[in-house]
Amino acid sequence: TPNKFSLYFSAPADSLPVLKGLNFDEKDAFVIEKTFRNDTIHYWIRDSLLYQQDTLTLSLNYLYTDTLNQLVPRTDTLRLAAKKVKKEEPKKKKKKDDEPEPTKFLSVNTHAPSSMDVFDYITMTFEEPVARFDSAAIHLRQKVDTIWTDVPFELEHDSLDVRRYNLYYDWEPGGEYEFAVDSTAFHGIYGLFTDKIKQAFKVRQIAEYG
């Protein structure tokens, strides 16, 4: 995508490479998504004025394995050219022209299986980093007798995956729960917001583990 670039290294590293913008200010310019080994790094460009530039020029300082198999510092200059995407011709509408365009939402992959493991937790992985969210718009309910009752939970930003949030709760074996998120609860860094989410599930009984 034009608002992201990625670096791939053949070996793990203890630290991230040092990146300096040569035709832009690199300070607070990126949301950095990296693997635990720092061998794959994605740089999400925050500012539309930056990723709409034809070319971004930057210097990259990192550790390089030389011919003696020793790690030595190396600096490269990179020129990142934005890929030109050909715009598709708008398709002719079969319906009335005054119908509104469908809303494009921020895509999210929710892990809340219908049969939840007693030691598992709910995860939400977004297609882009999240800029902000409304915690009051996130709900976890437990079915007590026939009544859905709100229960407290912990929501944490994943320490390794910048696009993932984890919801923790001490599940009651055999309990029935409903996870719900109101529309517009999460806003991505490029302006999209999420649609509403609602998923019901049941926690496995201890006896099911043999």
List where the protein language model places each region.
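N-terminal targeting or signal-anchor segments and their processing/structural boundaries
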Residues: 1-210
